[in-house]
A protein has these predicted regions:
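Walker A/P-loop
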Residues: 1-7
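Loop/turn-to-beta-strand initiation segments
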Residues: 9-11, 41-48, 75-82, 104
């Protein structure tokens, strides 16, 4: 069951490994990221899902992606759900305080259907 406040939203999965890994030069990475961020900023009823969120601040070009997302996240133009392991969160995400403060940490033991609904309800006030 989808909460009423989320019924008009689309969820898009972004594959960071493909986005960053297929580029040849740093400038090419930045161009792809800039294009994606501009596209996401125009889609106000879209939530992006990024698995392996730690890659935003860990891989070549990743820091550029994290920095480019920050303004859109602050203004509410970009809405994001990220997933990573506790170890990777502590090793990478916690080091970037400016990126970290734009998120609410939710620990999930196993993502069954009732848990997913609870997570979405927990993020609902931030999306309204």
């Amino acid at each position: 069951m989808v909460p009423d406040a989320l019924k008009n939203y689309s969820l898009i999965k972004i594959n960071i490994t493909s986005l960053i890994g297929e580029t040849v030069s740093e400038g090419n990475v930045e161009n792809r990221i800039d294009l994606l961020v501009r596209e996401l900023s125009d889609r106000l009823n879209t939530i992006i899902f990024i698995d392996e969120t730690h890659l935003l601040v860990n891989k070549a070009g990743g820091m550029d992606f994290a920095n480019m997302l920050k303004a859109g996240l602050d203004r509410g133009q970009i809405k994001m759900i990220g997933a990573t392991t506790t170890e990777e969160y502590e090793q990478y995400i916690l080091r970037d305080r400016a990126f970290l403060r734009r998120f609410q940490k939710i620990d999930v033991l196993e993502a069954d259907k009732p848990t997913v609904v609870k997570i979405l309800m927990g993020t609902l006030p931030k999306l309204e």
